[in-house]
Amino acid sequence: NEPMDHAYVPTTGHFLGLASLTVDPSRVGALIESAHTILAGLDPSDEMAYALYHKKLWSVHLNDQNGLKFDEDKSFGVVDLRRAFNQVWVLERNGYGQNGEFIGLDVKALRTQSKETSTKHLRNSRAIFLRLVDLCRTLDVAKVEDLRAARDYEELDLMIVNHLLGS
C-alpha cells in the first residue's frame, strides 16, 4: 500500500505556496484524494474549498477512510457520511465540474471477491455520490445561511444530519 510516513508537502496550502514559487504557477494544480487528506489528519472538504478558492482544484479522487492507518480506499461515504456530504456540498456549491474538471473514485474491493461482485465498490461509491448531490441540491440554503449568521452551529449540524436521515 502507499507509504504514509513521509509528507514533504503535507497540506494543500503548503503545496499551493510551493507551487506559487515555480517558473509557471499557472501550470500547477491540486488533485485531492479524500483518504490521503484524512490520513494527514485533515478534512477533505476544507482542503477542497481552499484549492477551489485559489482556482487550483484540478481533480478530486473520492473515497473513504477509517482513520490513521494505511490507505484503505474504501467506497465513498461508507465510513463517515457527514464528511462525504461536506465534500459534495463544497464541490456542488462551487459548480465543480462545469469547467472540465472531473471527479474520480479511487476505491478498491475490500477483499478478494467473486467476479460478479468485484465492481460493487464502484457502483456503491457512485450511488452514494449521486444521492449526496441530490441532498445538497435540496437542502434549504437560506436556512443554512440564517443559522450561520446566527452562529447557531448546533442547530445547523442537526438540520444537516436530519436532512441526511431523510427527516
Where are each of the predicted segments found?
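Histidine-acidic metal/acid-base catalytic patches
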Residues: 5-167
